[in-house]
Amino acid sequence: MANRNNYYPRTLRLQSWEVQKVEEVAYVSDKNRELLDKLAKAFWPGALTVILKRKEHIPSIMVSGGDTIGVRIPNLDLAIKIIELAGGILATTSANISGEATPKSYDELSEAIKSKVNILIDSGECKLGEASTIIDLTSDVPKILRKGAILIEEIEKIIGRVG
């Protein structure tokens, strides 16, 4: 959120795993489609963010001027309902200042975050309490950009070796 590291693009949260929905916002090559399908079946909804090449109609401000976008399906019924009401796709950012710990509850949110948003919904304590794992599928070799709630070993069991 505040003081965001521009290396990471914004994340688009999706209502459900559908290749067509992902392809509305990102390019998915044939090879990446197979990997994405395996990852989605294993880890979505859940704490896995997949980086793909964004389509041109996604405004550059949403991706910090870059050409990639993060895609994720959250594992929270309330979030899924909000995404559904927003048309099935919702641009989001994290609820922490870049580099700081991920809050597990409303009470752990920093005052800097609370002062910058118009609405906060307290949905209880986060079951994971850890950031999502981020995997980049924009090149021939999948690459882990951030270790998170899903272990690299779990990902490698599904799609093989990652960088």
Regions found by a protein language model. Give the residues of each.
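Active-site-adjacent structural elements in enzyme catalytic cores
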Residues: 1-163
